[in-house]
C-alpha cells in the first residue's frame, strides 16, 4: 500500500478507498515495527476510505497515538479499540453514520481518554442527543457536533469545565440552557442554524467569550445582560426575526388589584412589619422590581411592559435588548398635543413600521 508520510511519526492513508480489512495487515505490520522503534506513531490519518468499523489492529498497537482521523467513512460505531489509545488527544470522526445506540464504546467515561482527549469532532453525523459519556470527558477543549440532529443541550454540559470551543450549529436546538454559562474557559460558541428563540441572561457570565454565532435562529431580542460580554469580538445575528415579530406580538395585561395595592405600598413607602401581614404577602412585597426608567421611580411585580431598546455595543454594534417597564407610559414619550387621537392612531402602525425598519438597519446582522 502506498503511503503519504509527512514525517516518521505520521501515517497518512487518506482517500485510498480501502476497507478496514485491507488496513488490518498494514497496521499490524506497522505496530510490530514501532515496538522496537525509538519514535512512536503520533498521527494516523484514515479519512475518506471505506471503513465501516475501526481497524482491530488499533487495539494495543499504538499506545502513543495522539491524533486519529477517521472522517468521511461509513462508521456506525467507534469500537472498543478506541479505549486502548491512552494518549489520544484529537479524534476526528466527522461525516460518518454515528448516532445510533452503541455509537460510542462502553466505558468511555472510565477510560484514559477521559483525561487525555482534548479535541473531538463528530460533526456531520446522526446524533439526536449528546451522549452522556461525552459529558464526562473533562479534558475536552474543543467539541464539535455541528450538522447532526440534536434537539437540546443537556444541563450536564457544565461538566466540561475545560471547554474553549463549542460548535453545535446546524441542529434543531430550541433552548440554550443556563448551565452553559458555567464554562469559564469558553472562547467560541457556535449555535447558528438552529431554532433558538431566546438567549438566557446567564450567558453574560461567559467572561472569556470572544465569538458568538447565533445567526439563522428565531431570536426576537437579546437580554441586556449581554453587554457584560466585554471581550466579545465577533457577534453574528443575521437571519433572525429580532424586533419585527416581537413588536407584532407585544401585549400588555393590566395589573391585578393585588399588584396595584402592592405598588402603592412601595411607591408611597407605607411602613409595615412582619406582624402586620401574612407571609405570602410579605414575600410578594419583597419581590418588587424597580422600573429602569429614570423619570418614573415606579415598581412592578408580575405585570410589566416589555420594550426593545437599541444599545451601542463595543462601539460598532446596535443591539436590540429587552427592558421591563412598569407601564406603557414609560415605554415611549408623550405624543404631541397638536395631533388628534384619530390621526395619531391611524399613523401609529406606519410610524412603528418605519422606526423598526430604520433600527433594523443598524442591528448587526453578521
UniProtKB/Swiss-Prot annotation:
Residues 337-346 have a biased composition (Low complexity). The modification Phosphoserine is found at residue 19. Residues 337-356 are annotated as: Disordered. LRR repeats lie at residues 40-61, 64-86, 87-108, 116-138, 139-161, 162-184, 185-206, 208-229, 231-251. Keywords: Leucine-rich repeat, Phosphoprotein, Repeat. SMART domains: LRR_BAC, LRR_TYP. InterPro entries: Leu-rich_rpt (IPR001611), Leu-rich_rpt_typical-subtyp (IPR003591), LRR-SigEffector_domain (IPR050715), LRR_dom_sf (IPR032675). This is Leucine-rich repeat-containing protein 58. It comes from Mus musculus (Mouse).
Amino acid at each position: 500500500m502506498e503511503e503519504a508520510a509527512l514525517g516518521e511519526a505520521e501515517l497518512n492513508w487518506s482517500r485510498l478507498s480501502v476497507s478496514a480489512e485491507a488496513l488490518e495487515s498494514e497496521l499490524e505490520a506497522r505496530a510490530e515495527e514501532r515496538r522496537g522503534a525509538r519514535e512512536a506513531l503520533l498521527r494516523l490519518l484514515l479519512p475518506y476510505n471505506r471503513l465501516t468499523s475501526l481497524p482491530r489492529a488499533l487495539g494495543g498497537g499504538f499506545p502513543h497515538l495522539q491524533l486519529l482521523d477517521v472522517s468521511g467513512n461509513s462508521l456506525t460505531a467507534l469500537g472498543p479499540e478506541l479505549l486502548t489509545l491512552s494518549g489520544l488527544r484529537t479524534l476526528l470522526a466527522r461525516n460518518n453514520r454515528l448516532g445510533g445506540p452503541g455509537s460510542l464504546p462502553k466505558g468511555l467515561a472510565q477510560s484514559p481518554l477521559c483525561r487525555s482527549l482534548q479535541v473531538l469532532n463528530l460533526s456531520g453525523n446522526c446524533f439526536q442527543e449528546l451522549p452522556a459519556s461525552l459529558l464526562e470527558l473533562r479534558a475536552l477543549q474543543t467539541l464539535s457536533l455541528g450538522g447532526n440532529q440534536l434537539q437540546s443541550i443537556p444541563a450536564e454540559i457544565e461538566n466540561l469545565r475545560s471547554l474553549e470551543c463549542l460548535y453545535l450549529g446546524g441542529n434543531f436546538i430550541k433552548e440554550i440552557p443556563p448551565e452553559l454559562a458555567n464554562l469559564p474557559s469558553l472562547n467560541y460558541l457556535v449555535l447558528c442554524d438552529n431554532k433558538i428563540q431566546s438567549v438566557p441572561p446567564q450567558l453574560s457570565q461567559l467572561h472569556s467569550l470572544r465569538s458568538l454565532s447565533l445567526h439563522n435562529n428565531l431570536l426576537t431580542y437579546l437580554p441586556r445582560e449581554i453587554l457584560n460580554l466585554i471581550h466579545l469580538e465577533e457577534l453574528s445575528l443575521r437571519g433572525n426575526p429580532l424586533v419585527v415579530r416581537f413588536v407584532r406580538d407585544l401585549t400588555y395585561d393590566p395589573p391585578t388589584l393585588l399588584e396595584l395595592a402592592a405598588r402603592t405600598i412601595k411607591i408611597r413607602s407605607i411602613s409595615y412589619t412582619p406582624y402586620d401581614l401574612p407571609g405570602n404577602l410579605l414575600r410578594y412585597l419583597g419581590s418588587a422590581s424597580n422600573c429602569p426608567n429614570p423619570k418614573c421611580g415606579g415598581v412592578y411585580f408580575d405585570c410589566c411592559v416589555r420594550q426593545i431598546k437599541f444599545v451601542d455595543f463595543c462601539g460598532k454594534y446596535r443591539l436590540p435588548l429587552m427592558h421591563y417597564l412598569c407601564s406603557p407610559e414609560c415605554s415611549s414619550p408623550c405624543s404631541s398635543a397638536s395631533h388628534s387621537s384619530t390621526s395619531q392612531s391611524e399613523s401609529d402602525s406606519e410610524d412603528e413600521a418605519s422606526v423598526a425598519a430604520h433600527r433594523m438597519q443598524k442591528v448587526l446582522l453578521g
